[in-house]
Amino acid sequence: IDSSMLESSIRQLLEDRLLNCEKIEDASGIEQELVYRPRFYKAERRVAENIFRILNSEAYTNFEGEFSLIEEQERKVGLKLDPVQKEAVEAALQHKVLIITGGPGTGKTTIVRFMLGLMRPRIPSIGLAAPTGRAAKRITETTGAAASTIHRLLEASNMGFQRDRENPLDQELLILDETSMIDTTLMDYFLEAVPSASRLILVGDVDQLPSVGAGAVLLDLIESGTIPVVRLDHIFRQAADSFITVNAHKVRRGEVPDFSRLIQKDNAEKELLDFYFIKESNPEKIVEKILLMSTERIPQRFELDPIMDFQVLTPMHRGVTGSLHLNRKLQEKMNPAGISLEHREQLFRIGDKVMQQQNDYEKQVFNGDLGRIVNCDPKTKELHVQFEQEI
């Protein structure tokens, strides 16, 4: 498309008020024009306004200067925080709004668990939430505290969210995990429902891919300079034993991952690792190896359910190594012929794992939730899916 045509079209949309434009100065002082769809423009402005509202209000509970609580909690749980972890907990006591960011294995979960134990005696109403059911389930497992999805916290329904500025949340402390996954629209709805006197802690990895929806909320909040930020960069010993963690940090630093330990035919007696690299360039052979690994080698070595505990990721839909072809091959191998239903060139069978791809507020099932087909009726074209435990 010719750039002049594109600019002309944008100008016309701006005149018709179908787009919004905002002028800003970038880091080098050069003025730039940002173009938004109106609903995202309004949502982004409300996010900023609500952050300022919460920051500039008195908290329900004041912890300022009570740093002795940290040492008491350390003795209570038998844990010695490292200096940066301690800085994060001190900041949580001192500030109304805080961002804690760090890569895998840097102790984010440990800090959340520690803060919950420290603050709960003084703040009985604490809300812990994440953008997806799987993320919320993971928090519950690692902290021992009940967590929910943001949608469930806001009491989502087909009529919208029941919690808002007029009917705010009850919690005095709200902790959001996996904040990098939250898009501008959802953050807007969430912050609208946060009471002015509540404390807010946003936890996440700013170096992860941004949300699927519009916006890079966590990054923008950090770069705004208005919210205290604690960055965790130390990989703890247990995490340092994980090849996934080590290689994730290598990729982040622009380094080549450690491929020194490859899966070999004679590795039956070798120690179990969480990261392997298999070198292969032939697409058909890649599929063969994926099938072998997912249905035999890895489930047997690690005692995993090949369907519910295993996930194959691919960057494309089409082609031999695309998701459509791989799903068919995996289905044939893991869940062979039975009662099935065909829809849009996709064959569904009882026992298949499926993923919800859009929010269903009436059924309280949300985008990204995983379930398993428990019944299908080819005559009525109906599938019955049992989703994981409600969170």
Describe each region flagged by the PLM:
Residues 159-172, 183, 188-198, 307:
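Short basic/glycine-enriched coil/helix segment immediately N-terminal to the Walker B
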Residues 206-354, 360-362:
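Conserved helicase motor core of P-loop NTPases
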Residues 178, 204:
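Walker B catalytic acidic pair
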Residues 7, 20-174, 228-237, 244-280:
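ASCE P-loop NTPase motor cores of helicases and related translocases
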